[in-house]
Amino acid sequence: MRVKPDLSFRRLWDISFGFFGVQIAYALQSANISRIFATLGADPHNLSYFWILPPLAGIIVQPIVGALSDRTWNRFGRRIPYLIAGSAIAVAVMCLLPNAASFKGYIHAMWFGLIALMMLDTFINMAMQPFKMLVGDMVNERQKGLAYSIQSFLSNAGSLVGYLFPILFTYIGISNIAAPGVIPDSVIFSFYGGAAILILCTLYSSIRVKEMPPAEFRKFHQISDKELTEKNNFISLLRHAPKVFWTVGLVQFFCWSAFMYMWTYSTGAIADNVWHSTDPAFPTNQPGTGRAYYSPYKP
């Protein structure tokens, strides 16, 4: 098996740069969705019901995208087509979701918001996974630690920017207060800004990154033509998964259980316990919550 050549730091950066935009989108979703549904009239105690569809969609969509991209070879690459498609649809949904209040009637707004949330989570995941796969495809074993460190840095930087967006827009004078049932401009503009950055970051990585052609990929990964076209079902893959897969999977299971509680309830819980209000229209509610989250990051 041939050893993949070392890549320059710039090349490693380019492979993962789109991750910055993806994580901004994820942060906007996780920080603001509960607020959006509460603004539309959802009971704060029932917010978890709205968060059920995204992970259900992810359970179905992510394995399908992974399996399809493993067998996709065209002039645009192997992973890049899914990255572009996922980002493009996620951007469209990000522009539509904060306008759910435009629908007349509580039921219509809720259904639109619910479907938009499911699509947003699904296609953000579709845009995110190819970046992880690109590292495995293109980076040699010696540099993978550096490549994933760059990806982790961009991930955390994007999350921080996404979480702070509504605060920054409020700081420059965009209203964080709106009439009952109306989503504030600070949240709407945050989603617009996140959508713009997501598509720009994705285009940058898509243009800068050139994936290996199939023949070269097979040489570097010691894959035969038969193995490349061989189909393994989900049960077979689980049966032959290494021990580390199950170890990491168990840890991830409990981590993501905690994340879901945090994303669903922490905004309302902090607002209720600190400012004694869960009303989304309360003037100091949401920006104060954001400052409480990120006060450790501020000088």
Regions inferred by a protein language model and the residue ranges of each:
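C-terminal ends and interior cores of transmembrane alpha-helices
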Residues: P81-I107
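Intracellular loop-helix junctions on the cytosolic face of multi-pass helical membrane proteins
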Residues: M1-R10, A101, Y106-I115, M126-A127, ...
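Central cavity-lining transmembrane alpha-helices of secondary-active solute carriers
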Residues: L47-T72, A85-M94, A157-Y163, P299
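Intracellular helix-loop hinge segments at the cytoplasmic ends of transmembrane helices
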Residues: R35, K132-M138, G268
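Transmembrane alpha-helical cores of Major Facilitator Superfamily
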Residues: F20, Y49-L56, M118, S149-A157, ...
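Helix-loop boundary and gating motifs at the non-cytosolic
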Residues: M1-A57, W246-V251, C255-P283
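Juxtamembrane helix-start elements in MFS-like secondary transporters
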Residues: D43-W51, R79, A109, G113, ...
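Short helix-loop-helix connector
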Residues: G41-A42, S69, W73, F123, ...
